[in-house]
């Protein structure tokens, strides 16, 4: 898939913008604080209805307006789709082909994106919540049912934690009802995650071995707070551990086990990647991003859109070449932001260049 056209009204420093793109490489050049990242963020937001930079929708609204509108024309294998998001103080409205979408899971996945931003380099050593978010964003685009089950899980988890905080003593019968619901949704969330990580590991290892010239292997491990012996037993063992932890959870006023506490670990040649070099971290993250692209194509039949936000300068020529070879070979529409073309020595022909200045975007040329 690829985005043919994007229109922004009152988005951050863009008062009004209408732009059309190449189905291949699109490069946005400009000084810092001109709007390059805002532009990629808008594409990301149109896809996922959320920003990767802020949780506050009001920060997305142009300073002298009260509403935001984003519309995009997406070319999928199945045909052209129009997406629209409108934000105001009354909330947000999402539309597909002018039809309002009641559920988030009905909207997300229509336009898939993979973002590679400087903060992704913290994925290995950062908090476990970053790695859970990484899994949730990818899985939510690939499997809409996952988003629905995760939403149900979080709703029951909130109920359970609220009860634990407010109860003077445990009502075992009431807690048992919540436990059954939580274990049911949670087991399905974990099953989806485990399948995803297993598939992602195969793709990521292939890319990592190519980047390292066969010197390194990459493996991933889903680390669950729920102890289980096999995937088919997750529900029963999760439920058992919830019941076993009633007193501990009551004392701590929160739920101690479940997918909300799970983690993801990375290993290079069998060693924890927390102890890897900075160069190995860059190769690992690059391998993951290329694996995301490959896996989305394999599981959905359509390519995602790749957003590279100021990361090419973080990669040496070898890693740049591997990345661009992949997106060109797989025919992936790619958006690159940069302050200069000087370090992009490996750019191929047939790219479209845009200049970004103070919230305006001008097409330079198509290079053939």
Curated annotation (Swiss-Prot):
Cross-referenced SUPFAM superfamilies: P-loop containing nucleoside triphosphate hydrolases
InterPro entries registered for this protein in UniProt: DNA-binding_RecF, DNA-binding_RecF_CS, P-loop_NTPase, RecF/RecN/SMC_N, RecF_2
CC annotations in GO: cytoplasm
CDD domains: ABC_RecF
Domain of life the protein comes from: Bacteria
Gene3D superfamilies given in the database record: P-loop containing nucleotide triphosphate hydrolases, RecF/RecN/SMC, N-terminal domain
Binding positions (ATP): 30-37
Molecular functions (GO terms): ATP binding; single-stranded DNA binding
Stretch forming the signal peptide: none
Cited PANTHER family: DNA REPLICATION AND REPAIR PROTEIN RECF
NCBIfam families, per the entry: recf (TIGR00611)
Stated family: Belongs to the RecF family.
Primary role: The RecF protein is involved in DNA metabolism; it is required for DNA replication and normal SOS inducibility. RecF binds preferentially to single-stranded, linear DNA. It also seems to bind ATP.
Protein name: DNA replication and repair protein RecF
Gene that produces this protein: recF
